[in-house]
Design a protein with these regions (language model features):
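Loop-to-transmembrane alpha-helix initiation sites
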Residues: 109-119, 174-180
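Juxtamembrane "helix-exit" motif on the non-cytosolic side of transmembrane helices
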Residues: 158-171
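Helical transmembrane-bundle signal
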Residues: 13-27, 73-83, 97, 101-104, ...
Length: 206
């Protein structure tokens, strides 16, 4: 088993599920109201998307009711968390995690969290795939960043809300900063985890 890959897949799925819980909560607060379009802001009034760095947590939903959307999103978010942490390493576990994340994307679970979950699901399909690469200098270097790259990624996902509350105007003026940091840390986490698995496979074969 690719242990680092399993941890990354589970972590990404956890992030997607947690994002679903958060978005669903704010959608429920908007009550039994109909969205104006398929694209919604999870956070209702007094939040104004044009005045806050997180755009009031944008999402999309195919369900024409905020209350129903929020309830279903929270339920699916909880299921996603449980599946990611307990079952992603099992047969078809990665594919199911990706499917749950697609569901979150379609019913109000946000935009970025479900995409992270889908990536986690795709990684999950490789957990039990035999390793073919042999360690090289590049993979050994990347392996040294495990698990700290993943820790940094997870810390930033939560820290961005604190940073946003303190430097709202700065983040609004530099809107690409947060997605670039998230994407960069996510890619480094995946590569570091793969490097670690390559090294562990070599030790197991020795």
């Amino acid at each position: 088993m690719r242990e680092a890959t399993r941890i990354i897949a589970a972590s990404f799925g956890f992030v997607a599920g947690l994002g679903g819980l958060e978005h669903g909560y704010f959608e429920i607060l908007q009550g039994n109201a109909r969205p104006d379009s398929i694209m919604i802001a999870s956070m209702g009034a007094p939040c104004v998307p044009e005045e806050i760095w997180n755009l009031c947590e944008p999402a999309m939903t195919i369900i024409p009711n905020f209350l129903v959307t929020g309830i279903l999103t929270m339920v699916l978010g909880l299921v996603t968390i449980v599946w990611a942490l307990a079952f992603v390493h099992r047969g078809h576990g990665g594919a199911i995690l990706a499917s749950l994340s697609v569901g979150l994307l379609l019913i109000g679970g946000g935009l970025f969290p479900p995409v992270i979950g889908i990536i986690g699901g795709l990684l999950g399909t490789k957990i039990n795939t035999p390793m073919r690469k042999r360690p090289s200098a590049v993979w050994r270097m990347l392996a040294k960043m495990w698990p700290w790259a993943l820790v940094a990624f997870l810390i930033w996902l939560f820290a961005q809300f604190l940073v946003g509350s303190l430097f709202n105007q700065f983040l609004m003026e530099n809107a690409a900063l947060i997605p670039l940091l998230v994407l960069g840390l996510m890619v480094v986490s995946i590569l570091a985890g793969y490097g670690h698995d390559v090294q562990q496979n070599e030790r197991a074969d020795a």
